[in-house]
Amino acid sequence: MKKLALIFAGLSLLAFTGCKDDETPEQVFPLVGKWSPTKEVKTQVSATGAGFSDEIVYTDCQKESRWVFNENSTGQRTNRDLAGSTPTCSTISQRNFSYVYNPSEKNLEIKYQGTVVVEKSKVILLDDKTMNLKFEDTTDPTVYKSTTYTFKRVTQ
């Protein structure tokens, strides 16, 4: 009987100490912060399967552009590029927006101030240094179009 009790005690001890939760919780990084675009990829595929994908690497001037996501669901997009008769790096557009971000589904909706258009995107990657946003154009059901932006975090 003592052997049976020892075996039971040993198995119980093994059951309590032998199991370990191997799943590490997914780390959640904030969308809030200031982001610098580094490149974009434009993809287009027709219903016949013909298509292309172009990668556009931004210039140093274009990398000075900023997408700012504030905690109160507002933001600002500032685009910079070479402009003028003697091209200098200048702000070519600046737009305020509001946004709704669902981190569990990774959906992001951006509405620019003064418009009724809502741009819908998917957060493909979001970590402490990098974010990829994919915008899909569904206006033509026979052609798939998407633009994926890659950003580098400037600040949080």
Describe the function of each predicted region.
Residues 1-4:
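Positively charged n-region of N-terminal signal peptides that target proteins for export
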Residues 20-96, 100-156:
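Lipid interaction determinants
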